[in-house]
């Protein structure tokens, strides 16, 4: 696999040189300062490339070109935004970039109730607590239909939890849930979040699925002509939140998307952490099912704290948690072998160690939530070790089949 590292630009406290020292081959980045829906300027794309090259690596994957809420709801200037997305693909292709990640999550990107929860050994990790989330939804956000989305036991537990919360914890919970895209300074206040939720009134799961397919029908041909692989990131977590539909949460969702827009450029961002929060998702089987259309990989592990859906979970160490990471990597390596045999130019799949616990000097250094230097370095080293062992000529996968 092609080992990559997410970098949020010059504001990132972890440098490109740090990434190179950690063993990364390339950088994953985006132009977070460009307003969603606008075309990315050629000079800004070139500037980011030069910033990355100054650290000794190349910008190889875009994560993400945001999809505007106008596109998702098909309201306002959504057609203009689709045209701008197409033009951005052309410009990225002209700059030599071949992989573009995006997501179709309405309003909220990844959602956590704690950004620096204390895990074992004193490490800090991100966590989703379903009772805290219900307390936020019912008692802080005061969403009109919130009570209907939770069973009696959850509502009662949420009410107790809310009463026990300090005002400081209530404010922190609102900030954590209302945080914007990683790398973005944008976030939602409670009034802003209520307003954004109202824009999805009447947008059913089926309607949002149709909007995704219609969006892909416009952009996938451009991606195919320009030699770019576009890859949809799964919902995080993979279940409905705040009454909003989720449409990329399991194998059935991805099979529908790939079947409806059957272009080799239209593919999957395999995020084992996002999909792994849902116990029904068999990650090695999903990797095998969608192998030929996996264009980008996020390797991360979560530990589900309950046998139910939705559940509370936290981001565990990369080789711990509920996902069999060795099996997933084995499937990916076998797919790379098939691609080489078929002569595919994209035979090497870009992968990044997704998130990481804050450990050692991370705890005092500070970083974008989920993106500390040492926690990710440790994760990448462990993942690279699995890959190296499975690829060994004498003791690896190929030897086992002889």
From Swiss-Prot:
It catalyses: D-mannonate = 2-dehydro-3-deoxy-D-gluconate + H2O. Gene3D superfamilies: Divalent-metal-dependent TIM barrel enzymes. Its EC number is 4.2.1.8. Pfam families: UxuA. HAMAP family: UxuA. Belongs to the mannonate dehydratase family. This is Mannonate dehydratase. It comes from Rhizobium meliloti (strain 1021). The lineage of its organism: Bacteria, Pseudomonadati, Pseudomonadota, Alphaproteobacteria, Hyphomicrobiales.
